[in-house]
Design a protein with these regions (language model features):
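Glycine-rich FAD pyrophosphate-binding loop
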Residues: 25-48
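Beta1/beta-strand and adjacent pyrophosphate-binding region of the FAD-binding site
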Residues: 2-16, 34
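Dinucleotide-binding Rossmann-like beta1-alpha1 core, especially the glycine-rich loop
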Residues: 52-127, 131, 138, 252-254, ...
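Helix-loop-beta segment of a Rossmann-like dinucleotide-binding subdomain
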Residues: 5, 87-97, 109, 122, ...
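Flavin (FAD/FMN) cofactor-binding core of flavoprotein oxidoreductases
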Residues: 126-129, 218-223, 228-230, 303-379
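Helical element adjacent to the flavin cofactor pocket in flavoenzyme catalytic cores
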Residues: 141-195, 199-206, 388-399
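Flavin-dependent oxidoreductases
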Residues: 19, 185-288
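Short beta-strand to alpha-helix junction loop
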Residues: 61-72, 96-105, 142-161, 314-324, ...
């Protein structure tokens, strides 16, 4: 049974909800912290289905929270894995140019990395071959030595253990139902919460609207899937990524080194718009109301061609299937053949925030709140990498809101 009262109530048991709960407890040790997770265990959605890539932070312009927080987030999560004895592969990442048209984008990524202090090396084609003989590039490529790989499920499990040790009440199988005068309604009863922190991922906008926030924002879910290499298929020494289209938040189909020590890879992801928020496989978790709302919104985006949505949709149609993914990956790494990629990994869903007034995708982290509640609305990649640094930043923002109330009273 859920406790009837708590000082802080965190909704959502992904990596960000867990790090927020831990940071709240660290800064407000005399306060009680409760975390709600509607699933039977924490991290079963975006966090547990994450690619496991620990990003370095050079994709983002210096004026963004992503740029500000990713380098420190990378350092802290890598240190956490070492401290806890969790798997960590410091394999680095190559960003390769497919042709001459990609070279300006490569230079822009280097400029962004320099502006935020992220270590990067511009390599010649010969240097690339020495680092990863199978990588294909035009003239040069960018190498990120700080990019790494972790095991998301083990990170989440370790954070759950930390929460228990910190006397945080982690209530799994308990769903948020709504806001009421007597407190927060849950599937296990009403909780009188002094302050609500919303880290609900795919449902963050819905929770926020109960408190008068997210008026201009809605979650637009995107499905992502990877193909896994068959046992014995050739591996790679480092991640290999293309130069992305910097105007949208997706990094393109890439070749990712998996944990295990053998260099085994996966290729992907797809980035197809989902028709309901938890459209993982088949019709499981189907919600008619969500399907109708999201389908209508996506048809409108196609009609208006918001943020080049038609081009994104067409590109996704070309790469959505197995052959399309293999073809794209083969442009990055030699020796990628369809016969070696027959198995799909688990589907992940990106809780991408859409500004419905401006008809554009939000590129940076977004949050809103007041003296009663705080809502993390856009916590897409690299939020897993940033979990510790983002949680520290957000709890500071929460403290500012609570301090204003204390000063006024």
């Amino acid at each position: 049974m859920a406790p009837r009262t708590t000082d802080f109530l965190v909704v959502g048991g992904g990596i960000l909800g867990l790090t927020l709960a831990l940071e709240l407890k660290r800064r407000h040790g005399d306060c009680s912290v409760t975390l709600l997770e509607k699933e039977p265990a924490c991290g079963l959605h975006a966090s547990g289905r994450n690619s496991g890539v620990l990003h370095a932070g050079f994709y983002y312009t210096a004026d963004t929270l992503k740029a500000r927080l990713t380098r420190e987030g990378n350092r802290r999560l890598a240190a956490y894995c070492v401290e806890r004895g969790l798997p960590l592969d410091r394999c680095g990442k190559l960003v390769v140019a497919r042709d001459a048209a990609d070279l300006p984008g490569l230079d822009e990524l280097q400029r962004r990395g320099r502006a935020t202090g992220v270590p990067l090396e511009m390599l010649s084609a010969d240097d690339v071959r020495r680092l990863e003989p199978r990588a294909r590039t035009h003239e040069r490529a960018l190498f990120s030595p700080r990019t790494a790989t972790v095991q998301p499920t083990e990170v989440v499990a370790s954070l759950v253990a930390d929460a228990g040790a910190a006397d945080i009440a982690v209530l799994t199988g308990v769903a948020y139902r709504g806001r009421g005068r007597g407190g927060v309604f849950t599937s296990a009863g009403t909780i009188d919460a002094g302050y609500l922190v919303n880290a609900a991922g795919l449902y963050a906008d819905r929770v926020a609207r109960d408190y008068g926030f997210s008026e201009r924002y809605r979650i637009l879910p995107f499905r992502g899937r990877y193909l896994l290499a068959e046992p014995g298929a050739p591996g790679v020494r480092t991640h290999v990524y293309p130069v992305p289209a910097l105007a949208n938040p997706f990094l393109g189909v890439h070749v990712t080194r998996r944990l295990g020590g053998d260099g085994a890879v996966k290729i992907g992801p797809t980035a197809a718009p989902a028709l309901w928020r938890e459209q993982y496989d088949g019709w499981r978790n189907f919600r008619l109301d969500e399907c109708l709302t999201i389908a209508a919104r996506e048809l409108g985006m196609l009609w208006r061609d918001d943020f080049g949505f038609r081009r994104l949709a067409l590109a996704e149609l070309r790469t959505h299937g197995r052959r399309g993914l293999v073809r794209r990956a083969a442009g990055l790494v030699d020796g990628i053949h369809p016969a070696a990629f027959r198995r799909w990994g688990s589907t992940g869903i990106r809780a991408q925030l859409l500004d419905v007034r401006e008809h554009r995708l939000e590129m940076d982290f977004r949050y809103e709140g007041d003296d009663r509640s705080f809502h993390v609305l856009n916590a897409v990649s690299p939020a897993f990498t940033c979990a510790f640094s983002l949680a520290a930043y957000l709890v500071q923002r929460i403290g500012e809101r609570l301090h204003v109330v204390a000063a006024a009273s």
